[in-house]
């Protein structure tokens, strides 16, 4: 019995002898072979697998034959390379490797499917232990802000239905979005190739793409505070562009690589950018930890670059306080978000350093009062500080959310709803997919930052790609999303559409640069992407489902 068990544990092997003497055989020899070997070769292999042993098959005993060994390898996990289990997608459901920590909360002992922080339709996101940061200063400050912050939260209005879209609008994936400050229907979008698109989603068909502004990825865009037809853009080519949206003409205000490509160790890229209207400066930060400033009245550089993060680390984002213009918030891949006083900008002179466990994708002050801080970290945590005047050593709460990603995606960034007077509603895309009627979809989550509960998750059955770039309109109930190379406009579902037949969506499909060509990574590009586009390009006729986009909302109490 012991020999039988040990034989079954070993991987079965099949040794087949090959005749190398001659390739020709007569019909008589073939008949003899059939008589001598009544079973086919495949049948012998199947029999060998069943017996779990080693079988040697010899068709001829001629000299010069080299045996061929066929080893049947057992299925192993693609993640840990161990047998006995599998990991990966099974249909529309992803199965975790039990030997690895949970992909969502990064803690061992359970899988993603059984994670207590998992976002599903039955319950919302569970916040970690809440720490009360209230002190006497906080209460005094809250009393001063009481006229601005309503005592009762207004009802959330969620844009949960795709109203219109432009498919394959950009030639590469969308990296950033920005609404026009005065024209409600104008949306700006930047992509990985350096193009900037201008789309009037009110008329749908009016759209332009300017490709002569940057050579590689557009990371940030801001409208000029003095001329709303002009826009500033920061790119991975190390330049800040100043573009006229009417004509498409652009000028370069800052170039960190005047001598061109000198190697990866010296190539500078600009990521975070914001405008301080009170100070009259455009702020931009690079991938070496330095802050650069441009006077937007003269469009000339002012002062020397200032080291605001660890030297050699990328500054991912900048945000100016909307109420107190002296305060600046920065974040980077040195695992810190930092608060600065712009009157005393010096290296290692930050007012406070907010520690994180991994790279901080974004950090924002709250849009109305400027007293709260919202950060998104790649440790799958969204962190909220309720008051910048209290104890900032630890966040007021942490929300576990799936925003870890691979390098072929634009980083996820949780953003405030600028219309929410209670400063509690945030929006962010989700990385982990959910199985909806047999289809793997990646919803967009609306979360209540005050308690971590899931307010709504919106999705459309036609959008099967991940949606990392999301922007809420500052005045209208509109959500703009960038998924792969496409743009989508979401609006709240009309009550009349629940009874009447849903109107057809306005969708434009652009085929301008849909054919895949030989890819060559450009200088300054920080990654390569080969994302699958929404709607398969194999079929000529693209059908759009007529049933409604599925939405799950939580009732507020």
UniProtKB/Swiss-Prot annotation:
Renumbered ranges of motif DWD box: 328-343
Span of zinc fingers (CCHC-type): 100-117
Function according to Swiss-Prot or TrEMBL: May function as the substrate recognition module for a DCX (DDB1-CUL4-X-box) E3 ubiquitin-protein ligase complex including DDB1A and CUL4. Required for DNA repair. Binds to DDB1A to form the UV-damaged DNA-binding protein complex (the UV-DDB complex). The UV-DDB complex may recognize UV-induced DNA damage and recruit proteins of the nucleotide excision repair pathway (the NER pathway) to initiate DNA repair. Involved in UV-B tolerance and genome integrity. In association with ATCSA-1, is necessary for repair of UV-B-induced DNA lesions.
SUPFAM superfamilies assigned: WD40 repeat-like
Region feature (Disordered): 1-55, 515-538
UniProt note on tissues of expression: Expressed in roots and flowers. Expressed at low levels in stems.
Primary localization class, coarse: nucleus
Acidic residues composition bias: residue spans: 26-47
InterPro entries on file: DDB2, WD40/YVTN_repeat-like_dom_sf, WD40_repeat_dom_sf, WD40_rpt
Domain comment quoted from the record: The DWD box is required for interaction with DDB1A. Interblade loops of the WD repeat region mediate most of the interaction with DNA. A hairpin between blades 5 and 6 inserts into DNA minor groove and mediates recognition of lesions and separation of the damaged and undamaged strands.
WD repeat positions: 169-209, 213-255, 265-304, 310-350, 355-395, 415-458, 461-500
Entry keyword set: DNA damage, DNA repair, DNA-binding, Metal-binding, Nucleus, Repeat, Ubl conjugation pathway, WD repeat, Zinc, Zinc-finger
Description of what induces expression: Induced transiently by UV-B.
Cell location: Nucleus
Biological or metabolic pathway of the protein: Protein modification; protein ubiquitination
Summary of subunit composition and partner proteins: Component of the UV-DDB complex, which is composed of DDB1A and DDB2. Interacts with CUL4.
GO cellular component, one term: nucleus
Cystine pairings recorded for this chain: none
UniProt family annotation: Belongs to the WD repeat DDB2/WDR76 family.
UniProt-reported outcome of changing residue 343 to H: Does not impair interaction with DDB1A
Single biological process term from Gene Ontology: DNA repair
Matching Pfam families: WD40
One GO MF term attached to the UniProt entry: damaged DNA binding
Entry protein name: Protein DAMAGED DNA-BINDING 2
């Amino acid at each position: 019995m012991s020999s039988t068990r040990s034989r079954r544990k070993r991987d079965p092997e099949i040794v087949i002898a090959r005749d190398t003497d001659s390739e020709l055989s007569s019909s008589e020899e073939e008949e003899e072979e059939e008589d001598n070997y009544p079973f086919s070769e495949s049948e012998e292999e199947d029999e060998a697998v069943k017996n779990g042993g080693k079988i040697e098959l010899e068709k001829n005993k001629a000299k010069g034959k080299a045996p061929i060994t066929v080893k049947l390898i057992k299925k192993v996990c693609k993640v840990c390379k161990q047998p006995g289990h599998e990991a990966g997608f099974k249909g529309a459901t992803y199965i975790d490797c039990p030997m690895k920590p949970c992909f969502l909360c990064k803690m061992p002992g359970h899988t993603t499917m059984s994670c207590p922080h998992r976002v599903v339709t039955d319950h919302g996101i569970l916040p970690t232990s809440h720490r009360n940061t209230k002190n006497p200063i906080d209460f005094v400050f809250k009393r001063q802000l009481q006229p601005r912050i309503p005592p009762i939260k207004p009802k959330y209005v969620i844009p949960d239905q795709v109203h219109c879209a432009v498919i394959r609008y950009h030639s590469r994936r969308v990296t950033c979005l920005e609404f026009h400050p005065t024209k409600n229907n104008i949306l700006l979008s930047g992509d990985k190739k350096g193009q900037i698109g201008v789309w009037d989603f009110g008329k749908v068909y009016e759209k332009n793409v300017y490709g002569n502004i940057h050579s590689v990825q557009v990371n940030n865009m801001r409208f000029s505070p003095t001329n709303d037809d002009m826009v500033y853009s920061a790119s991975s080519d190390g330049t800040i562009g100043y573009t006229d949206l009417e004509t498409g003409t652009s000028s370069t205000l800052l170039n960190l690589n005047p001598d061109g490509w000198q190697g990866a160790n010296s190539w500078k890229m600009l990521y975070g950018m914001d405008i301080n209207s009170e100070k009259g400066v455009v702020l931009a930060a690079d991938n070496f930890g330095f802050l650069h400033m441009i006077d937007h009245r003269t469009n000339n550089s002012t002062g020397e670059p200032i080291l605001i993060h660890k030297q050699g680390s990328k500054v991912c984002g900048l945000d100016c306080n909307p109420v107190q213009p002296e305060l600046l918030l920065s974040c980077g891949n040195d695992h810190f978000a930092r608060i600065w006083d712009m009157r005393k900008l010096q290296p290692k002179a930050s007012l406070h350093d907010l520690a994180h466990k991994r790279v901080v994708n974004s950090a924002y002050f709250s849009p109305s009062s400027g007293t709260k801080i919202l950060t998104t970290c790649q440790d799958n945590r969204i962190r909220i500080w309720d008051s910048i005047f209290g104890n900032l050593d630890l966040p007021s709460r942490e929300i576990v959310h799936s925003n870890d990603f691979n390098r072929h995606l634009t980083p996820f960034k949780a953003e405030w709803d600028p219309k929410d007077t209670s400063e509690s509603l945030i929006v962010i895309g989700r990385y982990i997919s959910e199985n909806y009627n047999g289809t793997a979809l990646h919803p967009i989550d609306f979360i209540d930052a005050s308690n971590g509960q899931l307010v709504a998750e919106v999705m459309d059955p036609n959008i099967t790609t991940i949606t990392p770039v999301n922007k809420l309109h500052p005045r209208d109930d509109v959500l703009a999303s960038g998924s792969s190379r496409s743009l989508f406009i979401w609006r709240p579902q009309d009550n009349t559409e629940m009874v009447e037949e849903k109107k057809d969506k306005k969708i434009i499909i652009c085929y301008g640069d849909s054919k895949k060509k030989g890819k060559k990574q450009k200088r300054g590009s920080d990654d390569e992407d080969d994302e699958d586009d929404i709607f398969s390009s194999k079929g000529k006729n693209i059908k759009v489902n007529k049933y409604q986009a599925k939405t799950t909302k939580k009732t507020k109490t």
